[in-house]
Every structure is written in structure tokens, then in C-alpha cells.
């Protein structure tokens, strides 16, 4: 069997009760005369989050499921469609556990040779079930996640407690590639982490624990494996149940010949770079670039481990600077649809999109976060000259502005998270040094000024006049309330 494409964690995650993405591949290079076969492995992703191990949230739309259509066009112009149904076969795979938050386990002893090839004997497999599950299907137009970099181990050390730790020398989002030699089926666990404890063991306390990659070898010599349905943010990998090759091994454990980090991220086109004569600035740029890439998944996340959620304030706060480095037009196109899918009946935009979990208070509704739905389409127009997001989502933006207006008291909005995590006398969290009314009302004003510009762009003079007048009233109220 031959894998089609190099996509990782496909398709991108969405609010599945509203819509799901489908991905298209060209199979012409794989089809052969005579018998052909296609095999698919399914993981849980955000569709079904298990309770075992670490989880930020619990959400499930049921067991993983597959919808596929293969369209074949013959030389004579005729076509044939092959569609998934109850005549397809299914069985348990060697992936015995997969969680977007908790890790992945793979039991190589459960592999079935040739399962994805013509002529495989599937008589012991079960017929697929028709789940009857329906949602809106959309083509995934944004680029896939792929492996961008391969990161070798730069240091290997043993803790005082006797555990072996591999240092990859770089924090990144991704998975590992494990190569080992084994004479039996002794399971191996690999714990990734960004930090170390004082005793040099890995520390997952700030990144979501426990998380591990588990591998049970076949026990027949050299084997290699990498996870398929999860990822984490890490630099270090602590090993349990194996030893590095060449080290004392009195218990006959599997011997690791190599651990390589695979940096996975959204495969955006590089459009810019930075370099100067001052090393500090170059190092700062590299640090920021790694952080940006490690948080570019099928949504723009705030961290690649503990939450992996699309917190929206980053989408507009970082948009201009990141667009100097990467072409993100298609990723923002998906983000806009995610926001539309999560918009409430009253027009409110939650702080995360897709809204895979409903938070409360400011963590659900904060103007500085929801305003991405107004700000980012304008930035896309400024950057790429593309008016389609504005044309498509203008009515939804109007609903959001109406919602903010309903929350205003004499044109002042004073709720939400505010200047989140500012440095003040108390432990960081909600704004301490700047009242919420300052930032929330300021961004409300900014939203309305952009709505005036977009109304003019779309040839809606009445709307433009309405937003111009509203902006003037907000400005007057802001200065009256906050200007000393």
C-alpha cells in the first residue's frame, strides 16, 4: 500500500454539528490495471475526545466515521463512483488509543499484513455500519498540516532516577519518529515535555498531563513508528520501557536506535523573511517564528499542547506581522467560516472558534476576542485586495455589531477579559491595570469605523452613514468617560 498525500491530522477540525470538511486527492498515480484496493485508518481527533489521560475538554460526536467517494473517469469519457457504505469492511486497527489531548498508542502485533492491498482476506472483518449522521460538508480549501522539519536528538542523558531523556534542542509542535530494535513485545512509553524538573525528569505540569506516545513492538528486529492522530508541544522525550542502543541493558528491553522530532504545522507558503546584522534581533525573530509555526494548525491556537483551541484575539493581534512571513489567506478563510459556525442567535461571537466547548463569563464572550470577525476580513482586504470575505460575512458582522451595541451602556462596553494577563500586583489573569471599559469600548469603536469603510466598499452608503454616526457617539462617550 502507498499513502496518498503527506497530510497530517486531516481534515481540519470544525464545529462538527454545523459543518465538516472533506479533502480531495488525485489518485491517478496510484490506480493500476486489474485489482485495486483502498484502506483508511481513522483516529478520534476533536470529533471524539476520550476521558483517559489528559483532556482540556470532553466532547464527542460519536465514534470516528468515514465518508468517501472515489470518482474514476475512463479514457472513453465514462465515469464510475465508488462510495463508502455498508458493503465496506472494518476492523480494529493497531492504533489502540488516540486522543488529541492525551497521546496515542500503537500495538504493532496487531498489524495485518497486506490489509490495504488487493486480494487481502477480510472474511474476519465486520461490515461497516451506516451511522446516519449528517452535517453540512465543505471542501477544505486551506492547506494541510504537514511535517515541516525533522529535528535530531542533540543530547542524551540519564536522570538520577535512572530514566533516559532525549533532548531535541528545540521546542516545537509535532510528534516523534521512533526507531528501535526489539526481540520481544515489551511496550515502550515516550513522554514529551517542554520543561525539565530539578531532577532532570520531564515536566508536563504546564502543558497537560499525562500525555504519552505508546508503542508495542512486534519483537522481530528493527522497527520504526510515528503517531498519526495527535501532537504535542515539546523539546524533551523521556523513555520508559526501553534503553538507548549501546547502553547497558540487563533486562533485555527494546533498544532505541533513534528518536527524531517531526515538526508539524500548517503548510503555509513562505512569503517573507528577516535577517539583520544584530544577532539578538535574529534570535528574537527565530524564537517568534517557531512560536508562530507551532501554533498554526487548522486553527490558530494559543498553545500546541494544553488547549489547542482557536482563541480569536491572536487571529487579529498577530495577523499583520504574520502575513509578512506567511500567506494565510486560505487559513483565515477557514477561520471566518469557523466564526460564522459558532455565532449565536443574538449575534455574539464566542472567544474560540470553532466553539468545541462552551466556557462561561469572559471566557465565552469578550469583545476584544469576538471582534476578529470584523477586523480580520478588513486586514485580508488590505493585504491581498480580496473583497470576498467582506462580501460573504458582512451580514454576520452587522449582527455582531448589533450585539455589541446591545451590551453597551451609553456607548460604553465594560465586560470580558480585557487586557488579559497583564503584569500587575496580583497573579496574572483578567486585566488589573486597565479597566475593561477602556479596551472593550476602544475595540468597539474600531469595529464600527471598519464597518463604515466596508459599507462604503460594498456600495452601501446608508450603512456607512449609520456606522459613521455611531462611531462619533462612541468616541464622544469614551473621551467623556476615560479622558482626564
Q: What is the predicted function of each stretch?
A:
Residues 1-305, 313-314, 330-333, 350-357, ...:
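Extracellular/oxidizing-compartment recognition motifs
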Residues 371, 438, 442-445:
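Start-of-helix signal in alpha-solenoid helical-repeat scaffolds, especially tetratricopeptide repeats
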Residues 85-86, 91, 236, 244-287, ...:
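Active-site acid/base region of carbohydrate-active enzymes
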Residues 319, 378-381, 449-452, 456:
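Amphipathic alpha-helical segments within well-ordered protein domains
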Residues 26, 358-382:
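Thiamine diphosphate
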Residues 168, 309, 367-368, 442:
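Short helix-capping and inter-helix turn/linker motifs at the boundaries of alpha-helical repeat units
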Residues 442-457, 467:
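Conserved, charged catalytic cores of large soluble enzymes
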Amino acid at each position: 500500500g502507498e499513502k496518498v498525500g503527506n497530510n497530517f491530522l486531516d481534515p481540519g477540525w470544525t464545529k462538527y454539528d454545523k459543518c465538516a470538511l472533506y479533502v480531495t486527492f488525485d489518485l491517478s498515480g496510484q490506480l493500476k490495471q486489474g485489482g485495486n484496493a483502498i484502506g483508511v485508518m481513522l483516529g478520534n481527533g476533536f470529533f471524539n475526545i476520550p476521558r483517559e489521560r489528559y483532556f482540556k475538554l470532553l466532547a464527542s460526536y460519536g465514534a470516528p466515521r468515514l465518508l468517501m467517494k472515489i470518482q474514476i473517469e475512463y479514457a472513453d469519457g465514462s465515469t464510475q463512483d465508488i462510495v463508502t457504505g455498508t458493503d465496506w469492511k472494518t476492523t480494529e486497527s493497531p492504533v489502540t488509543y488516540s486522543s488529541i489531548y492525551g497521546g496515542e498508542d500503537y500495538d504493532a502485533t496487531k498489524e495485518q499484513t497486506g490489509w490495504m492491498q488487493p486480494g487481502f482476506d477480510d472474511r474476519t472483518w465486520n461490515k461497516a455500519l451506516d451511522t446516519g449522521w449528517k452535517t453540512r460538508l465543505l471542501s477544505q480549501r486551506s492547506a494541510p498540516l504537514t511535517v515541516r522539519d525533522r529535528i535530531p536528538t542533540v543530547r542524551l542523558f540519564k536522570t538520577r532516577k535512572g530514566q533516559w531523556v532525549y533532548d531535541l534542542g528545540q521546542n516545537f509542535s509535532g510528534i516523534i519518529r521512533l526507531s528501535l530494535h526489539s526481540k520481544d513485545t515489551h511496550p515502550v512509553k515516550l513522554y514529551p515535555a517542554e520543561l525539565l524538573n530539578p531532577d532532570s525528569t520531564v515536566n508536563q505540569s504546564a502543558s497537560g498531563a499525562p500525555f504519552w506516545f505508546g508503542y508495542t513492538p512486534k519483537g522481530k528486529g528493527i522497527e520504526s513508528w510515528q503517531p498519526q492522530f495527535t501532537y504535542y508541544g515539546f523539546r524533551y522525550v523521556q523513555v520508559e520501557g526501553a534503553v538507548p542502543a549501546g547502553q547497558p541493558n540487563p533486562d533485555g528491553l527494546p533498544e532505541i536506535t533513534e528518536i527524531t522530532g517531526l515538526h508539524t504545522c500548517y503548510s503555509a507558503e513562505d512569503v517573507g523573511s528577516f535577517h539583520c546584522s544584530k544577532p539578538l534581533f535574529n534570535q528574537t525573530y527565530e524564537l517568534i517564528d517557531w512560536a508562530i509555526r507551532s501554533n498554526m494548525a487548522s486553527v490558530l491556537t494559543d498553545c500546541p499542547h494544553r488547549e489547542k483551541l482557536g482563541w480569536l484575539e491572536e487571529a487579529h493581534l498577530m495577523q499583520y506581522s504574520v502575513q509578512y512571513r506567511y500567506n494565510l489567506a486560505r487559513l483565515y478563510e477557514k477561520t471566518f467560516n469557523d466564526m460564522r459556525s459558532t455565532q449565536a442567535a443574538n449575534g455574539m461571537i464566542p472567544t474560540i472558534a470553532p466553539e468545541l466547548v462552551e466556557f462561561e463569563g469572559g471566557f465565552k464572550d469578550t469583545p476584544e476576542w469576538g471582534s476578529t470577525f470584523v477586523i480580520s476580513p478588513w486586514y485580508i482586504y488590505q493585504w491581498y485586495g480580496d473583497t470576498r470575505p467582506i462580501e460573504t460575512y458582512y451580514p454576520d458582522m452587522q449582527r455582531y455589531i448589533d450585539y455589541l451595541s446591545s451590551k453597551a451602556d451609553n456607548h460604553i462596553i465594560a465586560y470580558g477579559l480585557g487586557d488579559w494577563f497583564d503584569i500587575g500586583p496580583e497573579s496574572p489573569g483578567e486585566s488589573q491595570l486597565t479597566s475593561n471599559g477602556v479596551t472593550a469600548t476602544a475595540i468597539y469603536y474600531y469595529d464600527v469605523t471598519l464597518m463604515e469603510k466596508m459599507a462604503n466598499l460594498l456600495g452601501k452608503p446608508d450603512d456607512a452613514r449609520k456606522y459613521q454616526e455611531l462611531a462619533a457617539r462612541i468616541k464622544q462617550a469614551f473621551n467623556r468617560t476615560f479622558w482626564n
